[in-house]
Curated annotation (Swiss-Prot):
Modified residues (Phosphoserine): 2
GO molecular function annotations of the record: polyubiquitin modification-dependent protein binding
Entry note about domains: Contains 2 ubiquitin-conjugating enzyme family-like (UEV-like) regions. These regions lack the critical Cys residues required for ubiquitination but retain the ability to bind ubiquitin.
Species of the source: Pongo abelii
InterPro entries assigned: BRE
Function: Component of the BRCA1-A complex, a complex that specifically recognizes 'Lys-63'-linked ubiquitinated histones H2A and H2AX at DNA lesions sites, leading to target the BRCA1-BARD1 heterodimer to sites of DNA damage at double-strand breaks (DSBs). The BRCA1-A complex also possesses deubiquitinase activity that specifically removes 'Lys-63'-linked ubiquitin on histones H2A and H2AX.
Source domain of life: Eukaryota
Keywords: Acetylation, Apoptosis, Cell cycle, Cell division, Chromatin regulator, Cytoplasm, DNA damage, DNA repair, Mitosis, Nucleus, Phosphoprotein, Repeat, Ubl conjugation pathway
Localization of this protein: Cytoplasm; Nucleus
Protein name: BRISC and BRCA1-A complex member 2
Annotated stretches, region: UEV-like 2: 275-364
Amino acid sequence: MSPEVALNRISPMLSPFISSVVRNGKVGLDATNCLRITDLKSGCTSLTPGPNCDRFKLHMPYAGETLKWDIIFNAQYPELPPDFIFGEDAEFLPDPSALQNLASWNPSNPECLLLVVKELVQQYHQFQCSRLRESSRLMFEYQTLLEEPQYGENMEIYAGKKNNWTGEFSARFLLKLPVDFSNIPTYLLKDVNEDPGEDVALLSVSFEDTEATQVYPKLYLSPRIEHALGGSSALHIPAFPGGGCLIDYVPQVCHLLTNKVQYVIQGYHKRREYIAAFLSHFGTGVVEYDAEGFTKLTLLLMWKDFCFLVHIDLPLFFPRDQPTLTFQSVYHFTNSGQLYSQAQKNYPYSPRWDGNEMAKRAKAYFKTFVPQFQEAAFANGKL
């Protein structure tokens, strides 16, 4: 159910509270997922004109789980705060004295429900942390992370028994990694979706037993960051080492991700330098180039009255990864009607060269390769 459809069924006096939650509500670390409501119902009599829904189920992301809490208002007394039922978490009994926004409920503030929900989630986090006492090993993992503010202040935990019959205990740690994404080129962060949310990297580590013999890490990137770093398959984090600890493993993942970000930033500046050098060396031979991301360049050149194009594709992780040169005849066609072309990656190249050196080496390579390309075009292409 879309937020607009849900809100149209809510009692008008309660609608501002719920609207603030579903339209602007960001609770917890996973800011890429908005809160949503389902199971709208009414406690009013059948004679009450609609819309009159005043109770619903709130879905919230937390530590890789989805919390489903029932929120119950009374449409007849909309100035009163709601009741909460915490679904499967029957053991969760929040401390009313710590719920300041519930005790001083202000119905004139549209965000009062959202503020109460945030307070409840904070208490729920403490409730989950307390459950780790059932495992000294998992408690150690938690306490060592807690001693590091960059991790301890950005962590969610979900713990509990996997199997009530065997007593197996499991836990999941979700951490917001302290990685700086602010210098990623803006062109890489475009066109993902209209409201991408916060740029964030979340590391989920699941302990399937109390002795940490089965540990499964997974990295989650917000959509813009995943796109900027080359897609979901571009970053592979190491397996959790046998006998390892989170306090050692998490910095390794941070370091890996930071290096990946630096590669992308460096690649952008190096590509810009590369294209600037080619503009200088080839002048009017430049047909077009990508002036935003500096990922493509096309040259129109001539060798002994033979005109040809060179398309240069610069990869995301340039200069570590070598550009592809595609030579294309302007006269000859393939059987499918395409201009005859050959792609080359086997040419003199070093990632240590600056843009000027790369342009000079490319010009020299063009002179040696074009004769055989021309011969191949005449032999295999059609005029």
